[in-house]
From Swiss-Prot:
Function: Probable transcription factor.
GO biological process, alphabetically ordered: positive regulation of transcription by RNA polymerase II; regulation of transcription by RNA polymerase II
CDD domains linked: MADS_MEF2_like
Tissues expressed in: Expressed in developing seeds and seedling shoots.
Lineage: Eukaryota, Viridiplantae, Streptophyta, Embryophyta, Tracheophyta
Protein species of origin: Oryza sativa subsp. japonica (Rice)
Pfam families recorded: K-box (PF01486), SRF-TF (PF00319)
GO molecular function, one term: protein dimerization activity
Keywords: DNA-binding, Nucleus, Transcription, Transcription regulation
Name of this protein: MADS-box transcription factor 20
Length: 233
């Protein structure tokens, strides 16, 4: 006859319960490890003893924190899906979108904290490498943008310098204005030489004003007055 089915129920004796827990706990964690390795899945096992002691296991390629975060996101999405199954008319509504986006928001906040160098203890080596690559890419983009802005600023400054040099060259090359001749204060400031008579040889004779002559004699030129005096004599 085969062995009958063992009924699973709470062990009444406290000592027996503790002994049974100590014997079966390693087997539970071992089974969790085996299924994680054989099936390449994320497995997490959390056990608290009757005295409050914690025993846990997480797949070697991840951490307990990341598995719990994935669990929380899944629960949020499952909650939204359950609401839609019960109330299909809510699909696409703000309530459904809010429920569905809560997990994404939490994941983005976590990623942002990691980028700021916070809460890194829960990251694996692979996560750290991915985070480092993201930071390097961000720094390269920032440097490229900075260099572009500096080049644009230098171009503007060079253009202004060229304009100033051109203006300076034009000012230096422009001719200076000639000084205006002094104005004559009297009508006799310029006394012309007039050929108005002939000498004994018949050649024109140049007649000039006598020394000390002024225009005070009735405002007439000296040669007219001289002609008048000669006629009288």
């Amino acid at each position: 006859m085969g062995r009958g089915k063992v009924q699973v129920r709470r062990i009444e004796n406290e000592v027996s319960r503790q002994v049974t827990f100590s014997k079966r706990r390693p087997g539970l964690l071992k089974k969790a490890h085996e299924i994680a390795v054989l099936c390449d899945v994320d497995v997490a096992a959390i056990v608290f003893s009757a005295k409050g002691n914690l025993f846990h296991y997480a797949s070697s390629h991840t951490t307990m924190e990341r598995i719990l975060e994935k669990y929380d996101r899944h629960e949020l999405l499952s909650e939204g899906n359950n609401v839609i199954e019960e109330f299909p008319e809510l699909e696409g509504s703000m309530s459904y979108d809010h429920i569905k986006l809560r997990g994404r928001i939490e994941a983005l906040k976590k990623s942002q904290r990691n980028l700021m160098g916070q809460e890194l203890d829960s990251l694996t080596l692979q996560d750290i490498q991915q985070l480092e690559n993201q930071i390097d890419t961000s720094l390269n983009n920032i440097r490229s943008r900075k260099e572009k802005l500096l080049m644009e600023k230098n171009t503007i400054l060079e253009k202004k310098i060229t304009e100033l040099e051109t203006l300076h060259t034009c000012i230096r090359a422009s001719p200076t204005k000639a000084a205006a001749p002094p104005a004559c204060n009297t009508a006799d400031a310029f006394v012309p030489n007039l050929n108005i008579c002939c000498g004994d040889s018949g050649e024109p004779e140049t007649v000039t004003a006598p020394l000390g002559w002024t225009s005070s004699n009735n405002g007439l030129p000296w040669w007219m007055l001289q002609s008048s005096s000669n006629g009288k004599s």
